[in-house]
Amino acid sequence: MKEVIDTVGRRKTSVARVFMSPGKGKIVVNKLPVEEYFKDEFKRSQALKPLAVAEKQNDFDITINVKGGGLTGQSGAVSLAIARALVEFDESIRAALRPDRLLTRDPRMVERKKYGKKKARKSFQFSKR
């Protein structure tokens, strides 16, 4: 029986659920290959950065369910979830992931729009005369 590690990662409004098991390096995101889902090379490398830092690219089969937000938030959520799964698999990997802040939940969220303003901080045009 295979051991499956289940973790969750969040970023902005995106939530990623990762199911990681020992395997050959097959990565599936929402039933699509990772290359098809994250077409942008930067977003794909950002999502898979914990595997690269831990040098475990071909050691695990990973199934990812991600929803909410856009691709940037989703790649950040996937990255955090994979990092947490790697630490759950082997606690010694934590030291390698720490310097790149891969285990830290990014707290930045979209600032809400305020009344009397055009956006969160932008004011309407002001005319003195």
UniProtKB/Swiss-Prot annotation:
SUPFAM superfamilies linked: Ribosomal protein S5 domain 2-like
Highest taxon of the lineage: Bacteria
Alphabetical keyword list: Ribonucleoprotein, Ribosomal protein
Chain intervals with Basic residues compositional bias: 114-129
Signal peptide: none
GO cellular component: cytoplasm; small ribosomal subunit
Keyword match Ribosomal protein: yes
Disordered as annotated region, ranges: 108-129
GO biological process, one term: translation
The UniProt record lists the keyword Cell cycle: no
GO molecular function: RNA binding; structural constituent of ribosome
Membership in a protein family: Belongs to the universal ribosomal protein uS9 family.
HAMAP family in UniProt: Ribosomal_uS9_B
Protein name as catalogued: Small ribosomal subunit protein uS9
Organism (species): Chlorobaculum tepidum (strain ATCC 49652 / DSM 12025 / NBRC 103806 / TLS) (Chlorobium tepidum)
